[in-house]
């Protein structure tokens, strides 16, 4: 039976006021912003709330203006970290300093609804070339965005792009150029950029480019956002105009435009504050990101829907979005299923205190889980081991078994090969009834980091990743990148004294209420094609967006009831009704809902092929691509036209700097099994200048780093000398770490084949077994050398660990009391059963069972109450470590009291039992 929604979801406690003038919210000083709020009669809703737990770790989820921490911004974060010069080479621009193409005017007209943002770009470039030109145009395109149309204008002619199969487009382009005609070929490149070539442009002819870009709206917390990153614009002055038309199905609370105060926001009359416009202009170009933040009123019980009618072919598409609120459920209400997998770095560098801390944290974590969970533990180094072949249900038997596995964990697995265990985990079909949450704990760096991050991103629909970076030498981008790619969280652990607290912080987030195993029941009246087919679990603060194309143009004359169904955080099935009223369809000019529905369906079809299911979806992918103007694995944009005057002079290729690519598909960040066609071979013909520019930048970076290092303490030289030489995947790093200087020098002076990303290497688990063994031997040699040096310098010590212990003797003495206290806490936690109780016989300390109240028929209830008090009383400073353990124990006690028909006596019994600790 479906649980009543009103018993599960409650309105947020809010107070809405009516400002007579725009208000300015409190924001970081680095993000100037103003807010416009509609002037309507306010409503005030106050609902009593019960927090998840008065003991739980409260995380700072930020505010809606903190867009750089939003999931959607991860694509741009990666660009900022790796392609520091990308902004200088966006659009039509020569590689040299003489700007043959210069942007003069740029206008963006956008329309936002609940799920889609359609943006029409108009860019006018001046062309000062004195010879015929083959130009190359590139812009970074986020994975949730698609180009659905483009045209090029020059010499009073308009050339419209059309989608064709990739092979036909390439052949047609080559034939047209060879015959002296004009041609344009557009692709999405492997590094995630939209790129097209403009062949045989006559000298001194200005060019106007029109693009239609359709993006999924960017949800962040309670807001809908539209972001144009500064890398989309050149770094010089030009005329810019931005117009945004907002049409939502819910009233708008506030509208903000970050960084640019000189904008105009107006709410449309008689729209119930559901429609508004925002305009902004500049004569000096764009210096910062353009971020529009719209906060609508949230309906936590009803998903919102849009029905779009396409006049072009008389078809219909539907989009559904939903942001439920779980904030007022108590910890006692939550009874959700989940799969927890812990992946622990057991390489040699984790020896000593780090591995001890990791094991202790693991022991606390596994006793924080509940009997609705599956769990498993992996240890990795040069090889990997795991507690179970596959995740097992959590109970006393499996808890005992995995505790024995944890006890034997040590830093004895050599190097750091993270890909093989991750592949083993992600290659296992996920169970959407048990949302998979993966915790990775590491202190090092891995080979081909970016390929690894791109790989896990393909599994973000079924796995959420949490990462911990330990120490000062960990690869920060690895830690952040893995978590962001799968919409999780990360924690950098620099100080071992807070190790367990920081670990439990992320575990607590993983326990927050979730809607999982989500499906849309479209009923029997509608024949639909849904995208995405499998819906990701909906975690706290996230928004669900799903699309569908109606297969049959025949639609019902009346409304249709469909449902969003999922497993709720209380353990019950939840159903959210959706009313589709086909008398209230919307005719968007650019068919944005149709386009994103097709885009998501294509991604699903390409993903099936990527996973090697031997499905041939080419015909359907080509059909969708051609119908909705979408670039895909099998389709490209092409425009050709016969030139009135055949270009006889030598054509010059104007090319932006070649950015080293990561392995990606057309829609995802992972290369398919088939190699992409090399549609840009003409760019290689004049690459010499690009290489020189790149090389000079690299040389400058290297010597800047060396100069900086020389000025630091001499001990840094030892760190550099011991550093492993690592070939950079991208060839260009962000801010280099001190220990990677030799790596950069080696990468620079190596042959391209030695430093470039190799798909074949990655497909064979990042190198052959022989190479991994060699790496392992090198790691072992390094460890032995370090130990020998330590022994020579410290003759009184028997081994490297003793040396470390002696060097830190004073610190250990200062922390002895805390360590003993922690060990005694861990002893108590180890005695807890899988259901949360402590049971008889209990030998850790004396418990007088004769004091047990007469209305309690189970000794375990009394023992558990006393142990709860014991932990709370004796270990107040370690509350964040045992919080979930206590929650589980108290929940078990309350369940037993409910069975005894005394559910309201928990507080009094807890107070009574405190007298006997």
From Swiss-Prot:
Keyword Coiled coil set for record: yes
Protein name: von Willebrand factor A domain-containing protein DDB_G0285975
Disordered: annotated segments: 12-51, 751-822
A GO-annotated cellular component: membrane
InterPro entries registered for this protein in UniProt: SNARE, T_SNARE_dom, VIT, VWF_A, vWFA_dom_sf
BP terms from Gene Ontology: vesicle-mediated transport
Record carries keyword ATP-binding: no
Biased composition (Low complexity): 13-51, 751-760, 774-818
Any single Pfam family the record assigns to this protein: VWA_3
t-SNARE coiled-coil homology domain boundaries: 679-741
Domain VWFA: 339-507
Keyword field: Coiled coil
PANTHER family: VON WILLEBRAND FACTOR A DOMAIN-CONTAINING PROTEIN 5A (PTHR45737), VON WILLEBRAND FACTOR A DOMAIN-CONTAINING PROTEIN DDB_G0267758-RELATED (PTHR45737:SF1)
Species of provenance: Dictyostelium discoideum
Disulfide bond sites: none
Lineage top rank: taxon: Eukaryota
VIT domain mapped to chain residues: 87-215
